[in-house]
From Swiss-Prot:
GO biological process: intracellular zinc ion homeostasis
Assembly mode: Homodimer.
PANTHER family referenced in this protein's UniProt entry, alphabetically: CATION-EFFLUX PUMP FIEF, MITOCHONDRIAL METAL TRANSPORTER 1-RELATED
Places the protein is found: Cell inner membrane
Membrane-traversing stretches: 11-31, 40-60, 81-101, 114-134, 156-176, 182-202
Keywords, in A-Z order: Cell inner membrane, Cell membrane, Ion transport, Iron, Iron transport, Membrane, Metal-binding, Transmembrane, Transmembrane helix, Transport, Zinc, Zinc transport
HAMAP family (alphabetical): Cation_efflux_FieF
Record Gene3D superfamilies: Cation efflux protein transmembrane domain, Cation efflux protein, cytoplasmic domain
Record-listed Zn(2+) binding positions: 45, 49, 153, 157
UniProt name for this protein: Cation-efflux pump FieF
Biological role stated in the UniProt entry: Divalent metal cation transporter which exports Zn(2+), Cd(2+) and possibly Fe(2+). May be involved in zinc and iron detoxification by efflux.
Record-level Gene Ontology MF annotations: cadmium ion transmembrane transporter activity; ferrous iron transmembrane transporter activity; metal ion binding; zinc efflux antiporter activity
Topology of the protein relative to the lipid bilayer: Multi-pass membrane protein
Amino acid sequence: MNPHYARLVTLAAVSATAVALVLFIMKVFAWWHTGSVSLLASLVDSLVDIAASLVNLLVVRYSLQPADTEHAFGHGKAESLAALAQSMFISGSALFLILTGLQHSLEPQTLHAPEVGMWVTLIALVATLLLVSFQRWVVKRTHSQAVRADMLHYQSDLLMNGAILVALALSWKGITRADSLFALGIGGYILYSALRMGYDAVQSLLDRALPDDEHRAIAEVIVNWPGIRGAHALRTRRSGPTRFIQLHLEMDDALPLVQAHQIADDLEQALLKRFPGADIIIHQDPVSAVPENQRGRLTA
């Protein structure tokens, strides 16, 4: 396991948990003073943030463990499980917000001291923006699915905090239904984000292939490699930080085994330069053993 990867994803998970805990305490104070249903929505979301980030932290630490005899391909799939668990947490909080918003839209309530809620929400907005910026930086360098799921979660919090600021300001001006209507909109958006996150996690657990641009990058390395007649049966997937790449090379029938092995080794090193840390399996086929309709199937 790359120690740089481990350090970054662990730091991102710890940072998210700490920010969620501080914001939760602040929002409890603000909700107690204002009675705002939008702030209640934000408070519940922060509580879910804490639970989700704690789960994320534990799972990330587990996923960073090296491969062992019982898990020969490592523990990277734990990241996808964390993302799936987060989507369930978030869906539950979103449904709660929608139901609460419906109730308060039917029975509008006057807010108390909305300026307190506005200040707390503004602080939460800035803190969340800083956290999301850091998480995005980590995702660009690690491609961690667990950190990406957490980042998407906190991105929805940015929108939510902005909406709460507007709702509190409108309620301050006497538009009492604004608070509950914004809570409904926030709940709907969070539910959509949760479902999208869950879909991506399930696709990873089902070993979805690497993105098209990465497939093209693999093909660009292979197709013009000296000593091969073609390539086929490219299969890829990702588990946590590790890409898995498998393919078959077509080689001259008379090529000595030692030379064929060296060509495959050199190609593997070239792919590793393009995709550091990848797990690569290359099978060498005599070209006569490959059916004509399968030869050279891999193109750039």
